[in-house]
């Protein structure tokens, strides 16, 4: 964990609540690059990844409760004790505004799709924003069509549903508003990290009080900028670039 802490500080990220698990290695991920749309990932997380070994005792529950924004990935629901830790965090959060679930479904981390659907379904009433692509929405709510998927997420309890559609752009819906945003056209070098940039821009837009349209435009553009670059975390755009 030493490298992770050092890199976070170098990038200006507050790491005071980042827990290390001495018994486990920092996971390593390799990405092959076959532009424009094939970027297979190879994860080295055996025997287990430290993020999946988090317990509720590791969590700064007051900080989670009081945070202006709180983001989880559903990968954390794939295994105990991380699953229970996530439920503890969401319980402390108590559906405070900007409680976000990234529907980031990675089959290799789950027993099967049915298990993933069951566990993701349990947390949707506890979050206010859900973000995923069509495949991830299908796992979460059984709907692949963007309109029906967004509606199903809203029916499950979220206040803002965002469905990423790749080259077809992004659909975002609340109970009173609908935004369709075309993809920002770039020459793709590496798609790895585009989703992270998209999510980061969503967080920035929500915290800045931007309109839904401006927020989704910024997110789409941020993802496109990163996909036009070779790197990932160090390729994230700044607000002036957007």
Where are these regions (language model features)?
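Hydrophobic anchor at the start of a short beta-strand
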Residues: 15, 97-99, 161, 178
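Structured loop/turn residues at beta-strand edges in well-structured enzyme cores
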Residues: 62-65, 125, 156
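Conserved phosphate-binding/catalytic region of the ribokinase-like
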Residues: 91-92, 142-242
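Conserved N-terminal subdomain of the carbohydrate kinase-like
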Residues: 1-74, 99
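Conserved beta-alpha-beta core of the PfkB/ribokinase-like small-molecule kinase fold
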Residues: 69-152, 168-170
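Short, hinge-like loop/turn segments at secondary-structure boundaries
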Residues: 5-10, 34-37, 116-120, 147-150, ...
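A non-catalytic, amphipathic alpha-helix used as a structural packing/dimerization or gating element
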Residues: 3, 88, 122, 126, ...
